A protein has these predicted regions:
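Conserved donor-binding/catalytic core segment of Leloir-type glycosyltransferases
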Residues: 201-225, 231-238, 246-247
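Conserved acidic donor-binding segment of nucleotide-sugar-dependent glycosyltransferases
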Residues: 338-339, 343-350, 359-364
């Protein structure tokens, strides 16, 4: 089988499936990407380069679409070069961030499988969750933002969504094309472990399960992942719990949602709140094995999200049997049950978040039980080694 993967990043969501397919000598795995940093065995990585950037005078409704088009054109040119060199895929599997837009024009008779991550809606998702009514201007921008996704929904032979909540966001006219199939969690790696140390070298601090540690992990410290509310909660908890250590993994940036003008959410909260920074440790982005060790020593791992894409990190934490305190939002409740696999709080209720974290810290035995229950959920339905064969069989079923 010849399979062509498309993603701006490499290997991103396709890491496990691309590597698994590449193990078979009968398969040729080609991956078109914008990433130049990583290579994987038996995968032919073909890097594309962008010819231009978004023009400054671009209509603001079109900036996201323009960015997608710039990537789409670069991927298309790269695919044409591969075609001229004699490569023809049996199937194309791509992320719908622009890369897949023109594939049917280059390989019209090749099945196109699209990975759909998020379709923007005026209701039922992230928009309006904060109680602010979207203006007509906002809605017009939102409608335009889906343009490239609508092209892919029309063009693709089939689509994959990793969760039911994400699939529900897609238009009903295209639901017949969509299969809900999660990426899978490496449950052999993300396991609970007792004798673990998490070392913060620049502070000469070693943390273990014997310590009282509240953890928070995110790609970006942003509103969509509840970072401001988390910091508010920590400012209250610090005054009540002198031995509590807080470890925050992630970068001082916004990946999703609105950015602040002239500052960041981290800077804003550090300026606004009375915090004991000697007990708050910003450790940046962690390599995966160190991140898993952080989960293993956590006394209470806090995860919050708008009704939006659920972070992989939540399921990693569940697989590690981590004591979890999370927001009671639909991306979370698809996987977690309050008082069974963790403790859930209202996203905007800081006092409730404080209460739930404090309860977790005071009731370790109960939280250990919830953590074990959470791991069982992952073992039952989201194991990578169970889902990977399903993904491969689904891909093969689409080849004519």
């Amino acid at each position: 089988m010849n399979i062509l993967f498309l993603h701006r990043n490499f290997p991103a969501q396709f890491r496990y499936i691309a590597q698994e397919l590449a193990k078979d000598p009968n398969n040729e795995v080609v991956f078109i990407t914008n990433n130049d940093k990583i290579n994987l065995p038996n995968i032919t990585k073909v890097q594309y380069k962008l010819k231009r950037q978004i023009p400054k005078d671009c209509h603001r409704y079109l900036r996201f679409v323009e960015e997608s088009l710039i990537h789409a054109q670069a991927v298309a040119e790269t695919a044409i070069t591969l075609k001229n060199q004699g490569f023809k895929p049996d199937i194309i599997y791509g992320h719908t961030w622009g890369q897949t837009m023109f594939m049917k024009d280059i390989f019209p008779d090749v099945p196109l499988l699209c990975y759909f991550e998020w379709f923007y809606n005026a209701k039922g998702g992230d928009i309006g969750f904060d109680g602010k009514e979207a203006s007509i201007d906002d809605l017009a921008k939102l409608r335009t933002k889906n343009s490239h996704l609508l092209i892919d929904l029309y063009s693709c032979d089939a689509g994959i969504c990793p969760t039911k909540f994400q699939a529900k966001q897609l238009p009903k006219e295209f639901q017949h094309k969509i299969k809900v199939l999660h990426d899978g969690v490496d449950t052999d790696f993300c396991t609970p472990k007792e004798d673990v140390k998490f070392v913060i070298e620049d502070k000469k601090l070693t943390l273990t399960k014997a310590d009282e540690v509240v953890t928070y992990a995110t790609r970006g410290m942003e509103e969509y992942r509840g970072f401001p509310q988390f910091m508010e909660a920590i400012s209250i908890l610090q005054k009540k719990r002198p031995n509590m250590q807080v470890v925050i993994a992630g970068e001082d940036r916004v990946c999703y949602g609105p950015q602040l003008v002239g500052t960041t959410y981290k800077k804003l909260m550090l300026e606004k709140l009375d915090l004991d920074l000697s007990r708050i440790h910003f450790v940046g982005s962690l390599i995966f094995n160190k991140y898993v060790d952080l989960l293993r020593i956590s006394s209470a791992h806090v995860y919050a999200t708008y009704p939006f894409v659920c972070s992989w990190s939540l399921l990693d934490a569940m697989s590690c049997a981590c004591p979890i305190v999370a927001s009671k939002t639909e991306p979370v409740t698809e996987f977690m049950t309050d008082n069974k696999t963790g403790l859930l709080f209202d996203f905007f209720n800081i006092n409730q978040e404080v209460e739930k974290i404090e309860y977790a810290l005071d009731n370790k035995e109960e939280m250990n039980e919830y953590g074990n229950n959470a791991r069982q959920v992952i073992l039952k339905s989201y194991q990578l080694k169970e889902l990977l064969p399903q993904q491969i069989n689904y891909i093969k079923s689409l080849i004519k």
